[in-house]
Amino acid sequence: MKVSSSIKADPSKGDKLVRRKGRLYVINKIDPNRKQRQAGPARKK
């Protein structure tokens, strides 16, 4: 999974933007290598 401060999703390639636990993810069931997560502050325990 790639982690970057700014992520972009391309719906024509099957990308979907999802917010989970306060973080932004790009998921792709067609091409799982396109997974991304937006970097942010460290999670609290």
UniProtKB/Swiss-Prot annotation:
Q: Which UniProt keywords apply?
A: Ribonucleoprotein, Ribosomal protein
Q: Does the keyword Ribonucleoprotein apply?
A: yes
The portions of this protein that span the membrane are none
Known InterPro entries for this protein? Ribosomal_bL36, Ribosomal_bL36_sp
UniProt-recorded name of the protein? Large ribosomal subunit protein bL36
Q: Which HAMAP family match?
A: Ribosomal_bL36
Q: What is one GO cellular-component annotation here? A: ribonucleoprotein complex
Read off the SUPFAM superfamilies from this record: Ribosomal protein L36
**Stretch list, region Disordered:** 1-20
The answer on whether this UniProt entry bears the keyword Calcium reads no
Recorded GO terms, molecular function? Answer: structural constituent of ribosome
Tell me, which GO biological process terms does this entry list? translation
Name of the gene encoding the protein in the UniProt record: rpmJ
Q: Which family does it belong to?
A: Belongs to the bacterial ribosomal protein bL36 family.
